[in-house]
Amino acid sequence: MDGKKLSNPFSTGNGGAAFENKIQTLFVTLMLSGGYAPCLPQGPIVRIKLQGAVDGYKTDDLIVFVEKPNENKPYKLLGQIKSSIKITKNNQVFAEVIQAAWSDFNNSDVFTKERDVIALITGPISKTDTDGVDGLLEHARHTCNCEEFITKVSRARFCSENVRNKLTAFKEQLKVVNNGKYVEKEELHKFLRHFHILGYDLAKKEGVALSLLKSRISQFNNNNPHPIWCQIEHEVRSFNQNAGTITLETLPKELVEYFKKSETSRISPDFAKENVEGDSEVGLATDWNHHPTAQKLAVANLIGSWNENNEADIKVVTQIVGDDYTNWIADLRETLQIHDRPLSYKNG
């Protein structure tokens, strides 16, 4: 009996392209909502180039441009998107990523060393790859020269065999693209300092990354954020097909307007205190940016809202914050006593 061979539904269903679209949509959502790009200095995302091969990029799935005040030249993240990958010396997908990255790294027309970064953006990868590659790249970024880097990685008690195996994988892949010659240690160290791996679970229908993104969208409007996410996806798909460049000016006006916060009147500090009904006083506005709980408040604001009586909600929050929920929430409860608190507690 003849029959077709079963294949991976993710591949036959064009899952790779769908994942790429979601990753690109993630960065556009960050741009629209005033978020920051990973691995770059904090500053507004001003444009995102999709399919940048036409402009000379080899790492071309998306190029994110970030600007900082009083600086004329933008910072760039060159991103290659792969739904899955293995970081080994023989993996063909990893070979393609390294070939493109090495070409861009040595092309001053598209990449500025000590300023721009290259990122392999992928779905969840194996624990071996995660631990090994993260350890390797962090050692590269926390050593001042190649000698210190090689010494630390080589010491058995200081570094794991897994990290050394990943170093071998990078060295062997770079040898192939360097005309069969091993890259000099100094250049290898520099390359690894500029290389990042970013993992997102956006291949899942309702993963943590998508939950955070929708929570961020909902900060601008209490309506259901899903239609807005879908609209951004649709626009990104169109730009991607045309190797376009996305800015706030090239997106539909109504989409950009959705992310504009309403104007709020500000009170001069001289009038920030006034008597209310005799002796009571309204206190000065709290500087939440420098408050001891600022980091926790930022995460809570990103999450949006959750139900403490719902175990599933608590589980998701715990996963996001990476800490015991009871410990994490304790400081936030204290902020509820402050007059201009940024949190509210219903039915409590």
Label each residue range with its predicted role.
Residues M31-K58, E67:
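A short acidic/basic microdomain associated with nuclease active sites
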Residues I23-L26:
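Hydrophobic alpha-helical segments that either span membranes
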